[in-house]
């Protein structure tokens, strides 16, 4: 019995060993070493090609000779991938597999959005930078333009510490002397010009195309002098599935560096050493040690949440999203929150001959700001000059106020007792129709309506320390404003290829636009019983400020009509030509110059398509571009820019000679002179560039040179009131030039089966210069501006606008140290410009140039690291 069992056990063990041996033999037989060489269609070996067993992490990379070796089972599939070539899959059925890879034209065939249409990258003749959604900056941003920071050569974005502050944006240098919209690029969202960026959440953006030279921007005519930024939003999918996505970001903002200010003990030591008596300015028996920067500044916590849904099929697509952002400023009392909603629906009808779409965008923004601008009323100003020896609050809980100095406003008092809030409501509706008439011929109609409502609410409490307000026992101001924008655009596109070599594109269109702006009213009331109701019930105030009625909101209607066209021609994808023209008419300008014409022309030569380049191994892509165009600037000008206007100038009292009763009446006075010859600012730009690609397009780039000149600058010039009813005239005088060079490099230094490193570097140099400021009619030597709004320097401008210098030229006194009394002294110059000593009372002749606000060089370096399903971006 025992023997039998042992035998059975032995037999079972032998069986197991046999099966294991059999499986091992089978595996050893099935495992196969595959070798081969990977080449392009010309037979050149490709180094760095990824070879991966499908569905596994088993892989290798080809060597410098294009050779590879990999252990893989028969019947499995190998995947060959390489930048600039299409992916190739090969089934393993032998031990030697050579692969020929085909070039991928996807990069060159990438669709680029241009004005009133799109084209492939290889057909572009002008300077256009495209940034896809995956390449945009991520984080908590209040302005979608900030997503481009460091991504586009020549695009400069200056942010503020206030979350409600508008970022200052310029492209290829300053081209206007006006402020605000007149200095910034023009925005086009989903083909609709002039849309507010506040209506678009960053997560809804699919791509952004930046038109940088005039040959690209001239199609937008009088609004494109500072470049055009075209935003394309995400639409629905056609896969028949409904997709729901969520994304969220959390950020903390901090002041990078605070000023090194004296603390209480250091200030006392300095005062004792220099015989300065500080006793009138603090309680000598109970001195404080207040760090006012720590009291005013904070870490600003921000968070952003976005949820979206999209789906559809081949006939109908839809999408919707909801975004919420809440951002704290680094200055206490400053914050911003916004909720944005967006919906989109598109469908095909009439047997797919008619595309219809409708979208609705809406946003509600709440802003709270502190006083950070007015000299003597600035929280930041007071933060620096307020005495560290005094406390934040008195013993009774009230805000400390040092009445022994001229500017006694406690910065924390201004944060909490002087409140400035704004509510913005925006709504936009867009309807589009595209009729496919015949193959290649489309008719388009775009209709847009945008409504903007603003409510400004200010309240200075009964504890406010501000001058002319603290005695009013609470003051409330409230004003409203509404802007309405209506647009209609219709245009026809025709694209056709003749004889496989001649590619022709034609576009012609018409647009109409009307802006009804500044429809509003405002009121100021004061002397409240308490601070509870603030501006919510101003009827409870004991006094109404008649002079405080908001008179700035004057309804204006501005209209513009335009005709435009474009022609594109390509011969054998080798020689490229584009020409555009636009004619705009605007009621903003003088009756003698309401129409302007803006043409452009550009050429390109794809050198790598020439026969003599077919056998070269250096360039994968080489294209030469040259172009010139003229665009204008009508942004920031209202319906009354060229009109004679009058406004309230005061009051006069009329006494009835019969009854003796008196009445007060408003007096009117001229506030602007009429200029029937006022016309567009015109910017002409010459651009030449080279696009290149090496190493199977693992290294690509662009180098460009431009010369941009803006003439007929619009500015206010002094005139004689003996001839005109008002002392200044808005006129076309002066010229600004911008010359620069830009370089962009895109590279993939590392690409393995699991890890990829993509890097992009852009560098730009721009030289800005004011060529002239005067003509035979209007003349000015220079203009001083740039008031620092710092206590003690209320009338001291630090910048000067003058010929031969850039816009933003600093023109200041040269600090030379301290005198024996501890006061600042400055270099003293004679009338010939010779340094003759120092002075504690410098005059205007002692000012000297000290750099410029215009950056000499801007650059951005972006890196993206991907490991399997993880990604890291660094900027």
PLM feature segments, named:
Residues 1-343, 348-349, 354-357, 363, ...:
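Short, small/polar-rich motifs associated with maturation and membrane association
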Residues 30, 308, 756-758, 852-875:
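Conserved C-terminal beta-signal and adjacent last beta-strands/turns
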Residues 136, 184-186, 300-303, 338-339, ...:
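Extracellular/periplasmic, surface-exposed regions of secreted and cell-surface proteins
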Residues 245-286, 521-523, 527, 640, ...:
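Conserved small-residue
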Residues 276-286, 303-304, 373-412:
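Acidic, glycine-rich flexible loop segments
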Residues 398-399, 537, 631-634, 808, ...:
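Feature marks flexible
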């Amino acid at each position: 019995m025992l023997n039998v069992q042992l035998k059975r056990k032995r037999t079972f063990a032998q069986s197991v060993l046999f099966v294991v041996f059999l499986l091992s033999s089978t595996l050893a037989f099935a495992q196969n070493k595959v070798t081969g060489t990977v080449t392009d269609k010309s037979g050149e070996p490709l180094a760095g090609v990824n070879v991966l067993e499908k569905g596994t992490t088993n892989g290798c990379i080809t060597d410098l000779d294009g050779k590879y070796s990999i252990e893989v089972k028969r019947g499995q599939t190998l995947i060959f991938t390489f930048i600039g070539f299409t992916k190739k899959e090969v089934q393993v059925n032998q031990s030697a597999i050579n692969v020929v890879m085909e070039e991928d034209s996807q990069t060159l065939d990438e669709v680029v959005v241009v004005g009133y249409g799109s084209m492939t990258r290889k057909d572009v003749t002008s300077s256009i930078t495209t940034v896809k959604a995956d390449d945009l900056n991520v984080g908590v941003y209040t302005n979608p333009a900030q997503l481009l920071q460091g991504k586009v050569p020549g695009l400069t974005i200056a942010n503020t510490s206030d979350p409600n502050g508008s970022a200052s944006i310029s492209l290829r240098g300053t081209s206007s002397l006006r402020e605000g919209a007149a200095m910034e690029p023009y925005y086009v969202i989903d083909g609709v010009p002039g849309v507010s960026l506040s209506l678009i959440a960053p997560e809804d953006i699919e791509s952004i195309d930046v038109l940088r030279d005039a040959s690209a921007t001239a199609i937008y005519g009088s609004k494109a002098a500072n470049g055009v930024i075209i935003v394309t939003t995400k639409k629905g999918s056609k896969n028949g599935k409904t997709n729901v996505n969520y994304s969220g970001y959390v950020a903390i903002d901090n002041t990078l560096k605070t000023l090194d200010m004296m603390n209480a003990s250091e200030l006392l030591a300095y005062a004792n050493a220099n015989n300065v008596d500080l006793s009138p300015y603090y309680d000598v028996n109970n001195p404080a040690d207040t760090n006012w920067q720590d009291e005013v500044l904070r870490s600003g916590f921000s968070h952003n949440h976005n949820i979206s849904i999209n789906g559809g099929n081949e006939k109908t697509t839809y999408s919707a999203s909801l975004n919420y952002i809440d951002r704290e400023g680094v200055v206490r009392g400053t914050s911003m929150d916004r909720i944005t909603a967006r919906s989109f629906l598109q469908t095909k009808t009439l047997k797919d001959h008619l595309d219809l779409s409708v979208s609705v965008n809406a946003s509600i923004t709440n802003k709270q700001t502190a006083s950070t601008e007015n000299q003597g009323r600035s929280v930041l100003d007071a933060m620096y000059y307020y005495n560290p020896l005094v406390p934040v609050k008195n013993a009774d809980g009230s805000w400390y106020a040092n009445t022994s100095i001229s500017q006694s406003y406690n910065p924390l008092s201004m944060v909490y007792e002087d409140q400035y809030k704004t509510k913005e409501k925006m709504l936009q509706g867009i309807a589009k129709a595209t009729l496919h008439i015949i193959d290649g011929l489309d008719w388009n109609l775009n209709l847009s309506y945008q409504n903007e409502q603003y409510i400004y609410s200010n309240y200075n409490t009964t504890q406010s320390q501000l001058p002319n307000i603290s005695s009013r026992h609470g003051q409330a101001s409230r004003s409203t404003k509404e802007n309405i924008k209506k647009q209609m655009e219709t245009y026809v596109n025709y694209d056709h290829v003749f004889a496989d070599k001649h590619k022709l594109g034609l576009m012609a269109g018409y647009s109409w636009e009307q802006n009804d702006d500044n429809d509003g009213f405002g009121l100021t009331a004061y002397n409240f019983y308490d601070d509870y109701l603030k501006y919510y019930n101003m009827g409870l105030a004991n006094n109404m400020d008649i002079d405080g009625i908001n008179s700035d909101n004057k309804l204006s209607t501005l209209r513009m009509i335009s005709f435009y066209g474009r022609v594109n021609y390509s011969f054998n994808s080798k020689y490229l030509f584009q020409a555009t023209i636009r004619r705009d008419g605007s009621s903003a300008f003088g009756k003698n110059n309401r129409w302007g014409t803006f043409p452009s022309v550009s050429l390109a030569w794809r050198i790598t398509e020439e026969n003599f380049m077919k056998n070269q191994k250096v360039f994968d892509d080489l294209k030469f571009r040259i172009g010139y165009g003229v665009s204008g600037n009508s942004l920031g000008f209202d319906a009354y820019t060229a009109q004679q206007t009058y406004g309230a100038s005061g009051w006069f009292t009329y006494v009835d000679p019969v009854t003796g009763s008196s009445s007060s009446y408003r007096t009117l006075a001229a506030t602007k002179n009429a200029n029937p010859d006022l016309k567009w600012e015109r910017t002409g730009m010459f651009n030449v560039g080279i696009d290149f690609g090496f190493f199977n397009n693992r290294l690509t780039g662009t180098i460009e040179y431009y010369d941009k000149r803006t003439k007929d600058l619009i500015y206010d010039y002094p005139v004689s009131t003996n001839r005109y009813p008002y002392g200044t005239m808005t006129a076309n005088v002066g010229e600004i030039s911008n010359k620069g060079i830009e370089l962009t490099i895109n590279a993939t230094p590392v690409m393995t089966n699991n890890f990829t490193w993509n890097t992009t570097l852009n560098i730009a140099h721009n030289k800005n210069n004011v060529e002239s400021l005067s003509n035979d009619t209007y003349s000015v030597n220079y203009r001083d501006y740039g008031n620092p709004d710092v206590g003690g320097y209320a009338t001291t401008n630090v910048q000067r606008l003058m010929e031969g210098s850039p816009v933003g030229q600093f023109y200041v006194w040269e600090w030379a140290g301290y005198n024996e009394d501890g006061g600042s002294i400055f270099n003293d110059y004679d009338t010939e410009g010779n340094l003759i000593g120092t002075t504690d009372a410098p005059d205007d002749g002692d000012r000297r140039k000290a750099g410029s606000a215009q950056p000499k060089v801007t650059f951005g370096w972006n890196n993206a690291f991907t490991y399997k399903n993880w990604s890291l971006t660094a900027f």
